[in-house]
């Protein structure tokens, strides 16, 4: 069993999913966002370098427009993302300001991190912001992202985006907050006897088999996308934790070594 004390992690990427930001009734969960901002501000005050990868643009757009179901058409999704992203950043800036924490926005597309020159520029931007103790709030630039045969600009989901960012900035730790307590041996929403897997050192068929399923009606990511992201972290020798984001201050407990969620690391 790996030592769970993660206090040595200096550079941390936190990914929060739509389900942690939007209530089941479609309303924005301001209480959770406030707790998240309080927690991440506290980490910066402890001399941690923190990057927040935040989903939720489409979900906030849905709430803003009074809609309850994510549309299937790409133009509608991108229009909602345009509405929701600006509102989401306004909420983040207001909440972080309550704790005297400065923030910034970085909207990425896949090709930005594919081409060496643009990749170097954006990673330099991350490093400068972290040096200034500013928290970058990262999302995919959903309004322009496409996924075509000859031109891919979409990451597909923010679980993978968070892993790409963690890799690019050489983070020590990735924390993915979701609507589930961690990785289970089978879907806990369907099976009452499902057991939490507390530690994973290799992504094999057994793990990928346990990770079947899709995301919430407001988001895109399911467990399979999270496992893909965790596989990258393990292969790069980085640590990652998958935990429930219902109470974002759980991050403090994770760093202090409490047995929460699933820890992914190289053996």
Swiss-Prot record:
Pathway: Amino-acid biosynthesis; L-proline biosynthesis; L-glutamate 5-semialdehyde from L-glutamate: step 1/2. GO terms for cellular component: cytosol. Its EC number is 2.7.2.11. CDD domains: AAK_G5K_ProB. It is an enzyme of class 2 (transferase). Gene3D superfamilies: Acetylglutamate kinase-like. It catalyses: L-glutamate + ATP = L-glutamyl 5-phosphate + ADP. It is found in: Cytoplasm. ATP binds at residues 15, 178-179, 220-226. Keywords: Amino-acid biosynthesis, ATP-binding, Cytoplasm, Kinase, Nucleotide-binding, Proline biosynthesis, Transferase. HAMAP family: ProB. NCBIfam families: proB (TIGR01027). Belongs to the glutamate 5-kinase family. This is Glutamate 5-kinase. It comes from Ligilactobacillus salivarius (strain UCC118). The lineage of its organism: Bacteria, Bacillati, Bacillota, Bacilli, Lactobacillales.
